[in-house]
Amino acid sequence: QGDALLIVGAAGGVGIAAIQVAKWIGAEIYATAGSDEKRDFLRLLGVEHIFDSRSLAFADQILEQTGGQGVDVVLNSLAGEAINRNFQVLKPFGRFLELGKRDFYENTKVGLRPFRNNISYFGIDADQLMLVHPELTRRLFAEIMALFGEGVLHPLPYHTFEAEDIVDAFRYMQQARQIGKIVITYHHGITRAQPPVAVGRKSLRFPADASYL
């Protein structure tokens, strides 16, 4: 409560959920999003400090708004150089929560210099949580459902595609246009399923009466 929290990519499903939790506990929210439409949506949620995630200048802007202090917590889902910029806005003794799996799988190296400020780095993978600590997972899920029942949390916005339009769904996702989640439905069945493509195998043939180098 009272901590300054930076939510990176706040218009996605995880980001919107994080905003709801942050407002519930009384955190001061700083958020980034990649389009005007997404930033307008965050304003509708009551977020005041909003920055462009497509520009690395957001770090300098956050430091300017906080008088050079930065934030207490970073909730990150971006890969590459954005990680280093997020470290720059983290206060001493701050917490860095890493949600993006891309850097995990690619074994991206993280410089140790920021850690001289006594910061903590947490890699978060819900799959591992369910696998290693199923009892904790069930307890957390029950607590979350109770918050929905109390009206503290609300369902996320989503954009639906029919299963037969799965290609369009992937294109939409690649354009990074979605706010919230993308949902695939089967209301009308799969009517345009593509037949499997047979891959022909051609063998090489060499005339016996020829020479080759």
Label each region the model flagged:
Residues 1-192, 199-213:
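4′-phosphopantetheine-dependent carrier domains
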